[in-house]
Amino acid sequence: MSCPAGVANPFASGGYSAGLAVAGEDPHIVPPLSFASLPLSSPSHVAETPITERAELVQVLASGEKPSADWRIGTEHEKFGFQLDDLRAPTFEGARGIEALLTGLTRFGWEPVQENGRTIALLRDGASVTLEPAGQLELSGAAVETLHHTCVETGTHLDEVAQVAGELQLGFLGMGFQPKWRRDQMPWMPKGRYQIMKNYMPKVGSLGLDMMTRTCTVQVNLDYATEADMVKKFRVSLALQPIATALFADSPFTEGKPNGYLSYRSHIWTDTDADRTGMLDFVFEDGFGYDRYVDYLLDVPMYFSYRDGVYHDASGTR
């Protein structure tokens, strides 16, 4: 990856600020604010003070407003791992497993995050490395000032991964959909939230488990100055989604054969979970803003609640 020389390290400034989230190769789920768009794989966080009133949720969105001088960009980068000898997806356990990869990355200053005694994520200077359900490796980058900083950050991450992966005889592939293996041949990571989602997804669509185990993406999170600015950016990002899907289409293979799609990943989202996917038409209606988006959020069924370090199944609860 080639980036401009002389770009200072910006990563000590902290993690994501509130901002718009725009994804490619095919986005379909587009929550506009980073508190709602934390990666599927992101470590869980618990608010110090419980939210008891709807107005508090609106205030969370409003509190993300920033002057343009303070705007930042946060990038999320996902990729599939595979064993170099047989091309199979690595399991979590084992000498060549995903946990071994995460442990190897700690030599670069990443701090391990554990769940039930297992390392399931890494943290460093406002960024994190996390796991999607089948072990897809995700960099959730720090909040940085420019695309050049994002380029440096992603390039550094990929170089670190390549060093450790090479020692484990692993490779990584950036594509929208797993090109070779069936769903039942994909491993599952030992994370509490994923077991809940694994049980729930077949109830709301036929392709949700494929979304979890066989897709990858790149996302960008953007800041906003005012409610009006948020609305404008949200509308523009949604309007550009079909173009982004076409430009970055990269999933033409399924189980080793052409699947007839340029973006099979886009097709996956058509039958995953209608309650939380698809185009959000109400964003283009007059009067859309923080209040209307909170109404939408409150109408989406929950997956789980997280209390005292334990995931509690709340799937389907409104």
In which residue ranges do the predicted regions lie?
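Intrinsic-disorder-associated, low-complexity terminal segments enriched in Asp/Asn/His/Tyr and depleted
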Residues: 9, 16, 26-28
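Compositionally biased, low-complexity intrinsically disordered regions
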Residues: 2-4, 17-18, 24-25
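Exposed, low-complexity/repetitive linear segments and helix-based recognition motifs
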Residues: 22-23, 135
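Terminal catalytic/cofactor-binding subdomain
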Residues: 3, 30-205, 214
